[in-house]
């Protein structure tokens, strides 16, 4: 099983188009050693031929151009993407669906019932796509695993996360199970597992159990401190209020990652443009390295 990181940044990417925080300004000026990043998305395959796209970011066309394995060129119109899985209904995880409207058949799309509701009403992307390629909608169960037709070698199992519904959703600040999910990906031959959760606001027992059972965790790296956006004047909300567990501080992501088995590969994804870990020379980045934690980058491949 291979997992390719198509995009590793949070919403807005890095640098964000209208942001002049130390990271974004420094990257543009060449005074900060960092990589540009597109918005969060991954793709997974069990046979190097048939892939599942997780989330469709606004940067999806750029991401696909930079992933030649997703364009096998077997016909005039072709793609290696057999299905799309949405882990939530956030703008930065769904807008790219509109850019994929030229498909010659309905996209096989998997999402939970709350996500389907939001993308049919508050942000009716599903209705819009009905006038183009259309969608073959499949509901993701919140208990037990599921298989995706045409994608051999990979098993999928979702679990609900405590995070937040999108700002446009009537459930904003009062989310229900299924508004956000994490997914365990299992190589059906080796049994090795990767746990994927780019939006994780609270460590609950069932989430912790899934992380402990995984050989690799690819998890929320949005913000370093809980008040990061407030201190910069970029937002009035804390990291946790936005549905993201900060890396540092009591009960932060680093504390949890430290408790995983030494053999577990630990990778952060969905990194906000303000997060100091993007600066490869920052003390925060050095602290991650000391804890054995990696920072995902666009084009990174995880093999299990």
UniProtKB/Swiss-Prot annotation:
Keywords, alphabetical: PQQ biosynthesis, Transport
Record Pfam families: Lactamase_B_2 (PF12706)
Keyword Membrane among UniProt keywords: no
Coiled-coil regions listed in the entry: none
GO biological process, one term: pyrroloquinoline quinone biosynthetic process
Residues passing through the membrane, by range: none
Key word Transport present: yes
Pathway terms, separated by semicolons: Cofactor biosynthesis; pyrroloquinoline quinone biosynthesis
Cross-referenced InterPro entries: Metallo-B-lactamas (IPR001279), PQQ_synth_PqqB (IPR011842), RibonucZ/Hydroxyglut_hydro (IPR036866)
Family to which the UniProt record says this protein belongs: Belongs to the PqqB family.
Its biological purpose: May be involved in the transport of PQQ or its precursor to the periplasm.
Protein name: Coenzyme PQQ synthesis protein B
Organism of origin: Azoarcus sp. (strain BH72)
Lineage summary: Bacteria, Pseudomonadati, Pseudomonadota, Betaproteobacteria, Rhodocyclales
